[in-house]
């Protein structure tokens, strides 16, 4: 009986998608670092490629990027999208083992914003009080059995 490699039911990416996504991320980061893209905005902006998610057929690479500094993320994404075919050609030699070179799609990486929102929420006095109260209760529960064992 053949084993099913469908990961849609589990909600996760396959090992192959993760591996290829990381290879594409590394190759894309090298192209950006070397400054091979002739665009004023891209040349003067440091761009972080935080993740690349591959489609199940490995034909689409969704690249999550964060421009560092004061650059507008949407403008950077638009500039990268306009050079997507050029980027695809520059990344190709690093990914020669792939049967098909993926189409690049660029999206803003909002995970840093989400982390800062969560951090801000955790710093509220009410939340800090509740967290310290939970720690006190946990510590007290751990102490009681040890005293009873002696």
From Swiss-Prot:
Record family assignment: Belongs to the RbfA family.
One term under GO cellular component: cytosol
Biological role stated in the UniProt entry: One of several proteins that assist in the late maturation steps of the functional core of the 30S ribosomal subunit. Associates with free 30S ribosomal subunits (but not with 30S subunits that are part of 70S ribosomes or polysomes). Required for efficient processing of 16S rRNA. May interact with the 5'-terminal helix region of 16S rRNA.
Annotated localization: Cytoplasm
Top-rank taxon, per record: Bacteria
Record region (Disordered): 131-150
Gene3D superfamilies: 3.30.300.20
MF terms (GO), sorted A to Z: ribosomal small subunit binding
One record GO biological process: maturation of SSU-rRNA
SUPFAM superfamilies: Ribosome-binding factor A, RbfA
A Pfam family recorded for this sequence: RBFA
Annotated protein name in UniProt: Ribosome-binding factor A
Main location (coarse class): cytoplasm
Keyword entries, A-Z: Cytoplasm, Ribosome biogenesis
Subunit field text: Monomer. Binds 30S ribosomal subunits, but not 50S ribosomal subunits or 70S ribosomes.
């Amino acid at each position: 009986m053949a084993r099913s490699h469908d990961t849609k039911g589990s909600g996760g990416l396959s090992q192959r998608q993760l591996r290829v996504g990381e290879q594409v991320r590394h190759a894309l980061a090298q192209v950006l670092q070397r400054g091979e893209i002739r665009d004023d905005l891209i040349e003067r902006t440091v761009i972080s490629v935080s993740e690349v998610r591959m489609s199940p057929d490995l034909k689409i690479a969704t690249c999550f990027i964060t421009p560092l500094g004061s650059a507008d993320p949407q403008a950077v994404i638009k500039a990268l999208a306009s050079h997507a075919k050029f980027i695809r050609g520059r990344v190709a030699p690093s990914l020669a083992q792939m049967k098909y070179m993926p189409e690049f799609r660029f999206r803003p990486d909002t995970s840093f914003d989400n982390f800062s929102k969560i951090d801000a929420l955790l710093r509220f006095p009410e939340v800090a009080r509740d967290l310290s109260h939970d720690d006190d209760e946990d510590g007290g529960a751990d102490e009681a059995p040890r005293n009873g064992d002696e």
